[in-house]
């Protein structure tokens, strides 16, 4: 079965996600719900959260030629979408495939733990104080090892620079983490060999002290198409991560008391 297309709705919070799902479920449309995945109640192993609806298209008249093809609808909160945007951005600039369950173990663990922490902020997953302390400690450690804040800020900056370079078919991005320098150069289609040579030299020069990526304009456009309103904008992800890392014992205790007060009596 093939996809006819898809759409994504980004809403304020988790109650709004379920309200929208209810609207789809009770709406007056002819399409048949073929599959339903609640990744908020049961997140994917990599930490992905959201709701996915797969409908079989049912049309009339000229539209009947598409009958049986699938339409995928994704529902996410703003924070869940910020997390997914950050994953896509890191994949692009570090040449990994975290989204596909591959890539560096530390990055995968970081995003998985960040997803857990973000779910606590959104009150979708109550969590004891000890567990929150463990998650915060893990995020502090992984954020430091991966230099997350500096990298994400620089990736967003790199995208802005890329969009200022016209008539390029490839972009060479060099992020020097030691000297905190970012360099972006564009190469035309005729300069592909030169771009590859410069890339190899930059990789040798920076080694483990930075990120070097040679990215095609097609890949940049693909990311822009997938995230048109948040293209490589990791601002909300960083702000949410900051909020988690600011957890203090009193705040954690208050949140735990709030959770316990809402539990039904046994």
Map each language-model feature to its residues.
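An acidic, glycine-/histidine-flanked metal-binding catalytic module
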Residues: 66-171, 175
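Short Gly/Thr-rich strand-loop-strand
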Residues: 24, 30-62
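Short, mixed-charge low-complexity intrinsically disordered segments
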Residues: 207-254
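Polyanion/phosphate-binding surface patch
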Residues: 1-8
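Helix N-cap motif at beta-to-alpha junctions
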Residues: 12-16
